[in-house]
């Protein structure tokens, strides 16, 4: 494998392990073994688990920006928010079993007070800001930001509850309720 392919394999593998085991419980050896590469290949590509995590976070950020850009092709802000919620609805089984990869990393990294905690915070803040922007456009008032707060809180709580209970059906039902709430505005 060339260096680019090894890097992609490491990032994909680390992403999956961080999601399922958590960042703190994942060791470099876990990544190496699951990626089916040598420790030397890992060390020639990344200097540490932290650097791998930075790349995972940069990937999340890039993907989220691309999703927002795609949603913004739709002129209807209610539809944009519904499309965003569809992503969670479609991933309900995985969320109920393993949680949300971004929120899981947030819980692991938020108290570290380092670049990783800043990066994960920026990703969630970007999502929150996008929600706020959609509600401001939809309701034509700056005071609509509290609706963005409400949506962010609801999603966060639902992800936590789904992982706690393992109940994908409950999660889906609540996502449907959130979509109905948005449509009613």
Language model feature labels by segment:
Residues 3-14, 31, 56-60, 64, ...:
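Generic hydrophobic, amphipathic alpha-helix propensity
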Residues 91, 111, 152-170, 181-185:
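Amphipathic C-terminal alpha-helical segment
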Residues 113-139, 149, 180:
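Amphipathic alpha-helical packing segments from all-alpha helical-bundle domains
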Residues 49, 56, 60-64, 123-127, ...:
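Hydrophobic/aromatic residues within well-ordered alpha-helical segments
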Residues 3, 10, 144-151:
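Short amphipathic alpha-helix in the helical subdomain of ABC transporter nucleotide-binding domains
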Residues 94-115:
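Amphipathic alpha-helical segments used for helix-helix packing
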Residues 9, 13, 17-51, 55:
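Helix-turn-helix
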Residues 55, 69-97, 148-151:
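Hydrophobic alpha-helical connector segments
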């Amino acid at each position: 494998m060339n260096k680019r392919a090894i890097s992609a394999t490491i990032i994909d593998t680390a992403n999956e392990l961080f999601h399922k085991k958590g960042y703190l419980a994942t060791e470099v050896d876990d990544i190496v073994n699951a990626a089916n590469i040598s420790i030397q290949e890992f060390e020639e590509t990344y200097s540490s688990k932290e650097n791998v995590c930075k790349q995972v976070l940069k990937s999340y950020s890039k993907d989220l920006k691309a999703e927002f850009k795609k949603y913004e092709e739709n002129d209807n802000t209610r539809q944009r928010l519904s499309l965003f919620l569809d992503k969670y609805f479609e991933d309900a089984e995985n969320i109920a079993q393993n949680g949300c990869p971004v929120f899981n990393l947030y819980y692991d990294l938020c108290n570290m007070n380092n670049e990783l905690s800043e990066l994960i915070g920026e990703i969630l803040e970007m999502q929150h800001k996008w929600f706020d922007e959609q509600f401001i456009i939809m309701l034509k008032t700056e005071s609509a930001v509290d609706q963005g707060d409400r949506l962010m809180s609801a999603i966060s709580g639902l992800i936590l509850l789904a992982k706690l209970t393992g109940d994908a059906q409950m999660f889906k039902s609540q996502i449907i309720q959130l979509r109905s709430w948005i449509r009613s505005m």
